[in-house]
Amino acid sequence: MHSTNQSSRLFQYPCKSTSTQYPIFIFPKFSSRKFVKSLRTSIDYKQEGASKEDLVVPSNVARRLPIIIKKSGKVSRYFIKGDSLELLCVDEEEDDSTSFCLGLDDGFWKLIRLTSSAAKDFFLPKQVSDNYISYVKWKFLHRVFSSALQVLATQAMFRAIGIGQSRSLASSAAFNWILKDGLGRLSRCIYTASLASAFDTNLKRVRFSTSVLFSLSIGVELMTPVFPQYFLLLASIANIAKQISLSCYLATGSAVHRSFAVADNLGEVSAKAQIQTVCFDNLGLLLAVLLNMLFQHNQRLQACLPFVLYPIFSTFDLLGIYQGLKHINLQTLTKDRLEIILERWIEFRQVPSPAEVSEEEGIGLLGSRGSKRVWPIRIGCLDPKAQIPTLSMMAMQSLCSDDGYFITMELSSQGFRRIPKSGIVICLREGANSVDVITSLLQTCYIRKSLGANRTKRSYLSFSDLTLQDWTLLTRESKRAARDDNIALNKQMQEQGWIVKNVLLSAEEQIRYIFDKNQL
């Protein structure tokens, strides 16, 4: 255990203890203070005799902040107007001093640019190797002609089994069947595009929810004999659900297999998984055949058999999936897993193993564990609709070019009843790496621990209870503690088997800000 600043009253580590005394910063109760103008998250800050009112922008004046957000092909900038924060699109802004203003007056070319950007985000992942584009081009050629051949084969099969002698009837049957498959594939495409990053960050939750969807699709297919006039509609709905479930299974399969491969034998683990799937599926097929043979002399019982067995078999199916997911110990880092690791580190100075984190993380069907806590932590850009305290807006004004991230607070409405809840936001800069993500989250966990400790000591702790001096000291000392912990924390995480090279973030968490040096 170490402490670089023995005189610090913010963070103190016990030498020998299994349950630590949380680092607490007790906010002074006197009101006569000198406020700071520079509210940076870095260690070197300057205090000046400026009051909070001197730095608040008048309501009739909008001050540009040096923070630019690029999202979905649009460029936006934060502005402070009065005591509120606004995020305005600056694509049309005629300002040659910054390279972010595109200056395209032609609406047609702007539409082309936005369309191409949307198509790129829809089809391509954000971080891939250089040869990925060439691979996708050849994959396009392969899949287009393969799909066309399947259509021709389907039409030929309908003719072979005697569905009508006329061309129109065979074509109609083939068209209806292809329509069913086409809707399923289209839904699968839309689903995977909308949840691309969720397959990494919420793998267990997405996989179990799609398994429930697959089970429901079986129930829909069982209803087709009851409503034969709606066969195409029911079959299409069931196929859509199956395609969505299949897309999730394929997208998450490699990550699941990688978690079990301890000797870089991913190919062997995947091959054995396919063998297991084929053998287990054949056993299920044999069970269904035996049950049908048992009731083959009673047509009424045989017709009712699927409806009787469906809830029983579905329960066992989902139970097996749920219990199996609990035994998957993912070594990749996400924001939620990092929170669990860093909280354990702050309290016990130990990094938990992937198995321990997996047990605490669970499946997460009711949402992430961190979002239900006091002062939940969020990574992303600031929401202008949320209430941002004045001291946080002043921190954004004084942001410097050396900062790889900044930390602010917000008051947002959550849940069905839209109850306001205080939270902490981490805004990462463009080019931030995994070290920046881990350091910023560790610093924020230190801040939350201090705020939570003060909340228990007082009946209520709000934004107004924090002065600029409080927040500056809190961010300064927490960042110092996070930086001091970096080497020891990273070493223990690697020893426990965590992959620290990258931190997997959701689409909203991947949004970065760009620091505009011309605004200084």
Curated annotation (Swiss-Prot):
Compartment annotation: Membrane
Cystine connections: none
Membrane-topology descriptor: Multi-pass membrane protein
Record family assignment: Belongs to the RUS1 family.
Protein name: Protein root UVB sensitive 4
InterPro entries: RUS_fam, UVB_sens_C, UVB_sens_RUS_dom
Keywords, alphabetical: Membrane, Transmembrane, Transmembrane helix
TM spans (from-to): 275-295, 301-321
Short name of any one Pfam family annotated for the protein: UVB_sens_C
GO cellular component, one term: chloroplast
GO annotation terms (biological process): anther development
